[in-house]
């Protein structure tokens, strides 16, 4: 079959529209990242994965940053992997005393013994509300931080590490390897958990739903999300101005993208860092249309 140049171009454009036409290029990502670094006097790491092509682009993508509460999405992903193996069910319950509660526990504080919580409720609290006690309960169920790190390694992630419980893991001391990841490593692990085959379909859908139900992320990537797009995310915050987010973003057309942004070593306010993440997101989203 002979195709004219015009017809061939039309086919190329059709193919491009079937997937994402493009993701942000390295030069543009570097420019926007450096602009925000200068504004915040911060260190910023970004990773974007185009799941249609498998290609990734990053800025400081292999540098370590504090995990902070972004670990909660991965933590519950690891818990779901145990559910998939039949070790327990999300409907199973746990009880805990008032002494178990730590700072920022808006959900678990309402379920102190003799009340109980299901593991479904625990992970909903940890991801959708960033409840710190819920995260500690999930980590304890998995055998503690080191066992959680081993589960990450089982997913092929030998970079991301959990060393402590909430709230100590948020110390974010510059140069400390404890409780850190890299933008690229965490993005790849998130992709495996939410879009890959690391979890069974039902568990994968549950993790995504918890992230879509995030109640504390409106000022970050969601602030610049185009109309008709969808997002599931998990934010984090810690000492030394640390602010972060990992996300799965579904454009109106095409395949999802993974977007992770980490900010640290700054005296900027939380609102300023939120705005920086929203601006970074806007540039990424505009390039993905």
Model region roles, listed by residue range:
Residues 1-8:
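Bacterial N-terminal signal peptides that target proteins for export
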Residues 22-39, 52, 140-141, 145, ...:
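Structured C-terminal helix/loop/strand segments within mature extracytoplasmic catalytic/sensor domains
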Residues 37-65, 88:
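Short, conserved catalytic-motif segment at the N-terminal edge
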Residues 43, 115, 136-190, 194-195:
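Mid-domain, small-residue-enriched loop/turn segments at the edges of structured enzyme/sensor domains
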Residues 51, 90-107, 142-143, 169, ...:
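Acidic helix-start/capping segments at beta-turn-to-alpha-helix junctions
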Residues 81-100, 145, 149-150, 200-204:
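Short, well-structured active-site flanking segments
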Residues 101-136, 145, 179:
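Conserved catalytic neighborhood of penicillin-recognizing serine enzymes
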């Amino acid at each position: 079959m002979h195709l004219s140049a015009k017809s061939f171009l039309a086919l190329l454009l059709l193919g491009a529209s079937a997937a994402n036409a493009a993701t942000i290029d390295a030069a543009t990502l570097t420019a926007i990242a450096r602009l925000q670094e200068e504004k915040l006097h911060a260190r910023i790491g970004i990773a974007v994965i185009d799941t249609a092509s498998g290609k990734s682009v990053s800025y400081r993508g292999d540098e370590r940053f504090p995990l902070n509460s972004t670990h909660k999405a991965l933590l519950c992903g690891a818990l779901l992997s145990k559910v998939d193996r039949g070790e327990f069910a999300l409907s199973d319950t746990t009880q805990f005393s008032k002494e178990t509660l730590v700072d920022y526990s808006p959900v678990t504080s309402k379920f102190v013994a003799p009340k109980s919580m299901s593991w479904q409720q625990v992970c909903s609290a940890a991801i959708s509300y960033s409840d710190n006690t819920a995260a500690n309960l999930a980590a304890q169920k998995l055998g503690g931080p080191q066992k959680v790190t081993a589960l990450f390694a089982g997913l092929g992630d030998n970079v991301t590490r959990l060393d402590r419980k909430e709230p100590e893991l948020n110390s974010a001391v510059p140069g400390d390897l404890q409780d850190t990841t890299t933008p690229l490593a965490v993005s790849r692990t998130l992709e495996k958990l939410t879009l890959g085959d690391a979890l069974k379909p039902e568990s994968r859908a549950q993790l995504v739903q918890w992230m879509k139900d995030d109640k504390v992320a409106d000022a970050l990537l969601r602030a610049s999300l185009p109309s008709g797009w969808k997002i599931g995310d998990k934010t984090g915050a810690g000492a030394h101005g640390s602010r972060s987010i990992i996300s799965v973003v579904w454009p109106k057309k095409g395949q999802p993208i993974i977007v992770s942004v980490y900010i640290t070593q700054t005296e900027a306010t939380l609102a300023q860092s939120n705005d920086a993440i929203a601006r970074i997101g806007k540039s990424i989203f505009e390039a993905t249309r």
